[in-house]
């Protein structure tokens, strides 16, 4: 049986790995997932990620998670907002800071995948992929 929401699977893998205090987690690769991970790296929620080929034509992402000096995870909450069955869109007027600007929405816009802060600077709205705090 095929998986219907591979992005939610990646977010769940990250959430579970951080709760288990793992340093690395792997997930199947796609360009959309890589763009989302780029945003998470820029915003300081994860340390880095590396894409490598597992088999001929099959790529996997190795995600290095980030923790505070006390050992607490940088990601307290990471949830999918827009799902394949229910898409959620926000215009620039309705795009407000998440969790008093301590968290972010990751948004797919006409100018690419970006954080809500970047979207407000550029004056664009779009589909809310997930929220991270």
From Swiss-Prot:
One of its GO terms (molecular function) is structural constituent of ribosome. It comes from the Bacteria. Keywords: Ribonucleoprotein, Ribosomal protein, RNA-binding, rRNA-binding. PANTHER family: 40S RIBOSOMAL PROTEIN S15A. NCBIfam families: PRK00136.1 (NF001109). Belongs to the universal ribosomal protein uS8 family. Part of the 30S ribosomal subunit. Contacts proteins S5 and S12. This is Small ribosomal subunit protein uS8. It comes from Orientia tsutsugamushi (strain Ikeda).
């Amino acid at each position: 049986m095929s998986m219907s929401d591979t992005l939610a699977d990646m977010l769940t893998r990250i959430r579970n790995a951080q709760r288990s205090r793992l340093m690395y987690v792997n997930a199947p690769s796609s360009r959309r997932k890589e763009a989302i991970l780029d945003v998470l790296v820029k915003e300081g929620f994860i340390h880095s990620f590396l894409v490598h080929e597992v088999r001929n034509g099959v790529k996997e992402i190795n995600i290095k998670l980030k923790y505070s000096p006390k050992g607490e995870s940088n990601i307290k909450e990471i949830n999918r907002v827009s799902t394949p069955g229910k898409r959620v869109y926000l215009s620039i007027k309705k795009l407000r800071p998440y969790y008093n600007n301590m968290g972010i929405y990751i948004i797919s816009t006409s100018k690419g995948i970006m954080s809500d802060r970047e979207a407000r600077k550029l004056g664009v709205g779009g589909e809310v992929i997930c929220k991270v705090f």
